[in-house]
């Protein structure tokens, strides 16, 4: 009931702050990822801009989208044009802090001058769409899809592989879901993001399997499955190795999933979430999996500058500890 309420109740300042506590939201983990990724050359991150949505605007996501007036939508569009410094000649990938609606790719891939001018409407709709999953009328009811007060605009990464598309336009790239323990600095699991068993069941054996879209996606996936899996097997160990090399600089706590997209010879880290909230977590041995601690009590949050300063302070402590250990080792050798 509590988690459902976060998604469907009208907002007040306290609820707004509680929603901002969600560790799965990109504004929590991206600053830590940006610091860790500086220490390697293998992975990239798409250029990303995140905003905290003003409470009065965010309340619109809890109103019926179909009843919003053209004037309201125009105000949202103009706000996003300014807030994100949009360029109508560019292509964008958009999401809330936790949800992109990528399974209908037309909702999150914004391109062309007219669509970019209406980008605010796209964000408003996908946020509304995700919150509706927590409605008591939704079957099944899913909470947490968009428990966030953030909106995100990212650069769109053009396809280098001429890959076929599923989900109404999404290029079918090889993707890797890597599970890590930030406390022990270990990779505890890795799995193909597009699991063949899951995907073929989704497209070919659910209630809407006879729809043209699902039939198309089933055929495309079967046709491209061998290519996806061959590329996954060829690169999984490499991806795992480079993730492991980053972990000492990753100053998050707990267990997380890290999603890596391959585009040609380029590898992008595109998403993260708490491991216990992630699909495919069954690839992690049960004896290694730990429950995630939840804290929904708001406090004074650190801004990004404070987070970076805090992380740099910890990194300096780690470096100082390593120097001391080396010096102690030399002293022991001299004594012996």
Which sequence ranges carry the predicted segments?
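Conserved protein-kinase catalytic-loop segment immediately C-terminal to the catalytic Asp
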Residues: 179, 261-262
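A short local loop/turn or secondary-structure capping micro-motif enriched for an aromatic residue
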Residues: 195-200, 276-280
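Active-site nucleotide/adenylate-binding loops and adjacent lid/helix of ATP-dependent enzymes
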Residues: 1-174, 179-197, 203-241
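C-terminal active-site "lid" helix and adjoining low-complexity regulatory extension at the edge
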Residues: 230-241, 249-254, 262-336
């Amino acid at each position: 009931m509590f988690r459902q309420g976060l998604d469907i109740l009208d907002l007040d300042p306290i609820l707004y702050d509680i929603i901002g506590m969600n560790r799965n939201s990109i504004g929590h983990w991206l600053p830590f990822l940006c610091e860790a990724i500086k220490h390697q050359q293998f992975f990239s991150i798409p250029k990303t801009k995140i905003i905290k949505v003003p409470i009065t605007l965010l309340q619109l996501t809890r109103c019926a989208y179909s009843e919003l007036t053209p004037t309201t939508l125009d105000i949202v569009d103009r706000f996003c044009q300014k807030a994100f410094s949009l360029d109508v000649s560019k292509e964008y990938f958009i999401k809330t802090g936790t949800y992109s609606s990528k399974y209908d790719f037309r909702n999150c891939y914004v391109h062309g001058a007219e669509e970019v001018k209406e980008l605010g409407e796209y964000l408003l709709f996908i946020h509304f769409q995700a919150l509706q999953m927590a409605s008591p009328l939704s079957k099944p009811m899913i909470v947490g899809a968009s428990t966030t007060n953030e909106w995100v605009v990212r650069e769109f990464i053009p396809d280098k592989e001429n890959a076929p598309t599923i989900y109404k336009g999404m290029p079918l790239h090889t993707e890797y879901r890597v599970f890590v323990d930030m406390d022990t600095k270990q990779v505890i699991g890795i799995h193909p993001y597009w699991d063949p068993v899951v995907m073929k069941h989704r497209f070919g054996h659910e209630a809407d399997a006879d729809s043209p879209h699902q039939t198309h996606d089933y055929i495309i996936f079967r046709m491209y499955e061998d290519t996806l899996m061959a590329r996954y097997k060829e690169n999984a160990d490499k991806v795992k190795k480079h993730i492991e090399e980053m972990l000492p600089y990753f100053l998050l706590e707990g267990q997380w999933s890290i999603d890596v997209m391959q585009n040609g010879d380029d590898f992008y880290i595109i998403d993260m979430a708490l491991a216990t909230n992630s699909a495919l977590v069954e690839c992690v041995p049960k004896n290694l999996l730990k429950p995630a601690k939840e804290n929904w009590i708001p406090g004074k949050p650190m801004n990004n500058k404070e987070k970076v300063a805090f992380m740099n302070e910890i990194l300096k402590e780690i470096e100082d500890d390593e120097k001391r250990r080396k010096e102690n080792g030399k002293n022991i050798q001299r004594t012996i």
